Every structure is written in C-alpha cells, then in structure tokens.
UniProtKB/Swiss-Prot annotation:
Cofactor note: Binds 1 Fe(2+) ion per subunit.
Binding site for substrate: 133-137, 166, 179, 183, 273
Signal sequence coordinates: none
Organism of this sequence: Trichlorobacter lovleyi (strain ATCC BAA-1151 / DSM 17278 / SZ)
InterPro entries in alphabetical order: ATPase_NBD, Gcp-like_dom, KAE1/TsaD, TsaD
Positions annotated to bind Fe cation: 111, 115, 301
Function: Required for the formation of a threonylcarbamoyl group on adenosine at position 37 (t(6)A37) in tRNAs that read codons beginning with adenine. Is involved in the transfer of the threonylcarbamoyl moiety of threonylcarbamoyl-AMP (TC-AMP) to the N6 group of A37, together with TsaE and TsaB. TsaD likely plays a direct catalytic role in this reaction.
Listed name of the protein: tRNA N6-adenosine threonylcarbamoyltransferase
Organism classification: Bacteria, Pseudomonadati, Thermodesulfobacteriota, Desulfuromonadia, Geobacterales
Keywords: Acyltransferase, Cytoplasm, Iron, Metal-binding, Transferase, tRNA processing
Length: 342
C-alpha cells in the first residue's frame, strides 16, 4: 500500500509518503520553531495559521519527492489527536478533503501511537514491549502488546519532560526551544556539581513529576549572585540532565521488571537527547534487554511515523468515515482498534 501521512498536532506541518508501512519514499517537515521562539513557546493561534499556510505546499512536496501522484495513493493516515485543536483541524481537514475528492480510504492515528511505532520504519520490534514516550507534551510508559493494543503504566502528573527542559532553558536565558542546547552544554559539565532532587524516584507508582525539578533550578538561580555562564552553566545543565535521566531510567527499569518485559522502545522528541540515549543504552546493557531508539529524524514530530499504524489499520479494513474529527484529548489506551486487527 502506498500511503500518504499528514501530521499537524503542534508546530510542525508534515507530510510523508510511505510504502507498505516501512519504506519511506518521502518525508517533509516544515518547522515553526523560529516563528514561536520570540514568544517563548508555541502560540496555538499562530500555529494554526501557519499550518493553513503550509499544509498544501508540504503535501505537494511530499508527493513530488516520492514521485507519485494522488491517483497512486491507496490510503491516507492523519494525526487525529491529541494536540492543539486548531492545528489538528488543519491536517484532518486536508486529509478528509483528499479522501473525499480522490475516493481514498482514510484513518485517524493517535500522535503518541506514531511516536512509539516510529522505529518500526527502521526495524520492527517483537511484541510485547515497554514503550517510554518522552516529548514536550508527554512523559508516558506503556505496555504494548500489538498495534492498537496499549496499556498505560505511568504518566507525568504535571510537566512533561520536554516542557521541563524548555522551561529550564528559559530560566537559564537560553531561549526557546532550549532542550537541545541544554543537552549540548551538559556534555561539557559535571553531572554531580549541583544536587537537584529526583521527584517521585522512590514512589511505588510508575508516574513522573518534573515541575519540582524546574522549581529547584529556579531556587538555585535565586541564590546565585550572577547569571551562570561558562563552566558554571555547563555544570548546571549537566546536573539538571542527570536528575532527569536518573528518574526516567529508574521508572523504566521498574516498569520492565513489573511487566516482565525484555524489549524497550523509547520515542518522542526528547529521545533525541544524547544523555538519555546513553542512559537507556546503559540500562539495556545492564539488564540484557533489546532496546530500540529511532534515529533523531524519526524522534521529533513527523508524518512518516504515522504510516506504521496507518498501514496496519487500513490493510485490515479499519478506516474512518468523513465524520471523523480532530480531538485535543485522546487517551492512547482508548484507541480500541485492536479487535478489528488480525
């Protein structure tokens, strides 16, 4: 099946053409980072307007780069949710319009489902496995028993880890988005220079909390006579990142042991973080388990990642009608398509 995928859940307008849920023929991502940087975060109204501006040229570019026409597209997968409602509506409206005009089967895919299956574009992982999804809006642990079969084990009770990175970067005067810059500066610092808390580290649940860590950074900065720079800034970034990674690793290890799983998948934008990738590799080596972390190009928001689930659903005859709408909130364990799959 040649599938067109469309993603507009936040601040990237993306489209991709993928064959048989594996072979990426094209993947186009138009980022709005520069647009939102001056506001220190994503402005929903601006994001929606930018999606409206870019959706048609992005889809056209994806088709051109793949060397296919709309007449050759056999299915359309689109991010239905969760995300910014106005942004989602742009992608869903485009997908429904193409499906109607060209009589192409359509399916809505969960954004997080895309992230946790993104690595399948490189190499499928046998089920069941544990999935850690870390991004600007999510920090979730799932047990995955098959495509469409997800059970949540733990989630953040406040800030997502990517949000904590961006807010900390703002406190440090690094601008938005600052996660990648903190990661780069951390590589030159000492992870033990500043003792930051590890929220919920010893809590029996598999939930996360990062708002307190962000507050701890603010408290530390208020005690300093000047804005940190140079080696001091590097140490602060390294110490913050060490705290984040320790919490993520400990909770992930606890989930693996609780569920008796031998395979781990890490996805989402924060999976680009070099410190986290290294920490998870160390965990996998120590526990002798299989680890999959997609290449960075598949970690951030993109449309190609939707094709794995989209192709599986459409191939099994699971499709949505034109009454399908975008939804800002949509728990992954309520996707409930697995009963229709072989």
């Amino acid at each position: 099946m040649v599938l067109l995928a469309i993603e507009t859940s936040c601040d990237e307008t993306a489209a991709a053409v993928v064959r048989d849920g594996r072979l990426v023929l094209s993947s186009v991502v138009s980022s709005q980072v520069a647009v939102h940087a001056e506001y220190g975060g994503v402005v929903p109204e601006i994001a929606s307007r930018k999606h409206l501006e870019m959706i048609t040229p992005v889809v056209r570019q994806a088709l051109d780069e793949a060397g296919v026409s709309l007449a050759e597209i056999e299915g359309i997968a689109v991010t239905r949710g969760p995300g910014l409602l106005g942004a989602l509506l742009v992608g869903v409206s485009m997908a429904k319009s193409l499906a109607l005009a060209c009589k192409i089967p359509l399916v809505g895919v969960h954004h997080i489902e895309g992230h946790l299956l993104a690595g399948f574009l490189e190499q499928p992982v046998a089920f069941p496995f544990l999935a850690l999804v870390v991004s600007g809006g999510h920090t979730h642990l799932y047990r995955v028993d098959g495509i469409g079969r997800y059970r949540i084990l733990g989630r953040t009770i406040d800030d997502a880890v990517g949000e904590a990175y961006d807010k900390t970067a703002t406190l440090l005067g690094l601008g938005y988005p600052g996660g990648a810059l903190i990661d780069r500066l951390a590589q030159q610092g000492s992870p033990t220079a500043v003792k930051f808390p590890r929220p919920l580290l010893h809590d029996k649940s598999l939930n996360f909390s990062f708002s307190g860590l962000k507050t701890a950074v603010l408290t530390h900065l208020k005690k300093q006579p000047h804005v940190p720079e140079g080696a001091e800034l590097h140490d602060l970034c390294a110490s913050f990142q060490a705290a984040v990674c320790e919490v993520l690793v400990k909770k992930t290890e606890a989930a693996l042991k609780q569920e008796g799983l031998q395979r781990l998948v890490v996805g989402g934008g924060v999976a680009c973080n070099s410190g986290l990738r290294h920490a998870m590799q160390q965990l996998a080596t120590r526990l002798k388990i299989e680890l999959q972390i997609p290449p960075p190009v598949l970690c951030g928001d993109n449309a190609a990642m939707l094709a794995v689930a989209g192709d599986a659903y459409l191939s099994a005859g699971c499709q949505d009608d034109l009454a399908m709408d975008a939804t800002a909130t949509w728990p992954l364990d309520q996707v409930a398509r697995w009963e229709q799959l072989p």
